[in-house]
Amino acid sequence: MKKTNLLLISALFAASTLQAQTTDLTKGLSIWFDKPCSLSGMASFYNYSADRDWEERSLPIGNASFGGNIFGSIAAERITLNEKTLWRGGPNTSGGAEYYWNVNKESAHLLPEIRQAFVDNDLKKAAKLTRENFNGLAGYEDYSEQPFRFGSYTTLGEAYIETGLSEIGMSDYKRVLSIDSALAVVSFQKDDVKYERTYFASYPDSAMVWKFTADKPGMQNLTFSYKGNPEAEGKMVAAGDKGLLYVGKLKNNGMEFALRIQAQHKGGSVKATADGKLVAKGADEVIFLLTADTDYKINFNPDFKDPKAYVGVDPVASTDAMMKAASARSYDELKARHQEDYLSLFNRVKISLNPNAPMTLEYPSIYDLPTYKRLASYRKGKPDYKLEEIYYQYGRYLLIASSRPGNMPANLQGLWANGVDGPWRVDYHNNINIQMNYWPACPTNLAECNWPLIDFIRTLVKPGEKVAQSYFGARGWTASISGNIFGFASPLSSQDMSWNFNPMAGPWLATHVWEYYDYTRDKQFLKEVGYPLIKSSAIFSVDFLWKRPDGSYTAAPSTSPEHGPVDEGATFVHAVIREILLNAIDAAKALGVDAKERKQWQEVLDNLVPYKTGRYGQLMEWSRDIDDPKDEHRHVNHLFGLHPGHTLSPITTPELAKAARIVLEHRGDGATGWSMGWKLNQWARLHDGNHAYKLFGNLLKNGTLDNLWDTHPPFQIDGNFGGTAGVTELLLQSHMGFIQLLPALPDAWEEGSIEGLLARGNFEVDLRWANGQLQEAVITSNAGQPCQVRYGDQTLNFKTKKGQTYTITSVDGKLVKK
């Protein structure tokens, strides 16, 4: 479970008060269904596409380490299980540590020849040399090499609880995920009995809790069983009279893991059987407690000769300790501690969109409609502002459930996966996907959820130094397109450079380290953790560049990730380098260090090849004007400087902003879920709220499954986070050095409010608007920084004191501080 010894995290945020929940959870912020899932996809471990119920209709719970998906079937509850660090691959496969780390090619000596080929306009030669020499040695699929060293995130298995009931005669069925109470609840009537099941995953108690009850005594006749990962060896055995223990080892790398289950009951009996089951008979209620762990330990300084560099936990002992602690508490105490912890984060932000708008659906109350039917109505063009609020807050729920201090970050599917392998290994994709996962973290006041990402970045530094030296003769560290939990930072074996060559993955990740500081102003963090990561990434970026005879700097070879040719100076690469060098300069200034390096970084910035516009007026994606206005590719890499960067803006670079707009017009308003999420943010940065809102609508209509998970297709969680971040950008921006109030408010949201957003400089901001105009902004200074506020063309500057709150209104075209 919690595997990291973290440095002190600044106590930036006050816990919210636990609020009582309504009995009918569908009345709050919830995702719910009126039909149970089928059991047809049970144990489809080798074919995720066959299990549509898991992808489209299951409901996820998690404590960032241990997760599950609730299906709510009647005859047998099915719950898929995941532990965040259960991975195949790494240095402990049969190939050993030397085999695992022997993944880089020594290619730096070829850079002069490639660059000369660009000078000679021999683009084929430059591409060929890059293709053949700047890939790596590790395969990306388990059939491509044995043993499979990159590995994949893999399932912990599935739990089943047979009930002895059937759907015949069932009524009043509801399966609810309450995102404002972090509970999943299944309820239904059967033979004049109301059955209810409640599920949650507790971060403070490192346990998953399931409660089965009914409104009449003696109705719980349950059989718990477990189906393990087929690529593991293990056995379920009794652990006491009412408990089970499964200890397994993955065949690929010998990773050991453990799952414990303990039953508590009122009335009747519960007994563990010799064949690894728990059987309850005639109980009034049964509570299942589950704990899970692996032998994985995070390692920031791995020994490249040690096959067990990432082994350091005894999961049998750790799950036992977790279970003893959890079982010592009552169900009510476990639930209260879980909700208090969750709500201390979730309740920081509240949003209300058009609260007085009349209902437009043909139901007495919008809450009478299950979520998938509301989504179907929304797809037909019927407004549903409450659904938009739910989607926004669901992104925050998913981040809390999949990323908390003490573990690895949210992956391509957050925490939840249902197979031995999954799409793109369910890995850490470093060319936008993992970064997008964390776009909403700071702006929606979940800054501490960044810590798993920061720790992940720290695992890449030592391996990334080898990558930088081998391929570019560079100092510092970098990463490549795909990462795992074992420090993998190298390119993969594919010679398709359009996706496999992205040395800017490291610098892009490092910009998130600066973002965390910029929002929190935690100088201890910056000094001890942040700046060393940023500085080393900046050093790599400078060494990576080619200083041409005319004194300008460019990136050769380079690519625009997943799109187009090997190039002399792809715009994306220059934009990322601008960002990390500016971050490094600001970080060094904040600490009062490295004046010499600051001067060098500024010299590179001053001479870096600038943004270019092409024959269509577009911001060029490559060094040559080869953009196709009919190309609607999902990646919009060359607008990195617009978002998530800050070197393109309608305020500071209006002509380049116009060129960026042309790019977005050419790319269109469709594509994959995550791509629509990115373009939503980019349109918001252009201050075009109506077009951004169109992208938000398209994301919900065309990129969202019935359980509100984002779909590529298939399911990828990044689009959920991109959507939440994009809505925030519509209402508040702070990337240009000042706080912009309602910078891209769409006409559709005529009235509304949002509370608790975080702006850079560590300002908490509440906003209220009516008739499309700002009514009031309430700004709390958490760090005592000077504050500059902008609303439209109005600006206001004032000094602040730490802990003080300031109210801003607009009077006669001027911002006024009360």
Predicted feature residues:
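Bacterial Sec-dependent N-terminal signal peptides
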Residues: 1-22
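Aromatic-residue-lined binding/catalytic grooves and analogous aromatic/hydrophobic interfacial grooves
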Residues: 21-497, 515, 535-541, 548, ...
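Short, surface-exposed recognition loops and adjoining beta-strand edges that mediate ligand/DNA contacts
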Residues: 409-427, 548-562, 740-754
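Well-ordered alpha-helical segments within folded domains of soluble proteins
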Residues: 431-442, 503-514, 572-582, 637-646, ...
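Non-catalytic carbohydrate-binding regions of carbohydrate-active enzymes
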Residues: 514-521, 525, 529, 537-547, ...
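Acidic/histidine-rich catalytic neighborhood
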Residues: 536-587
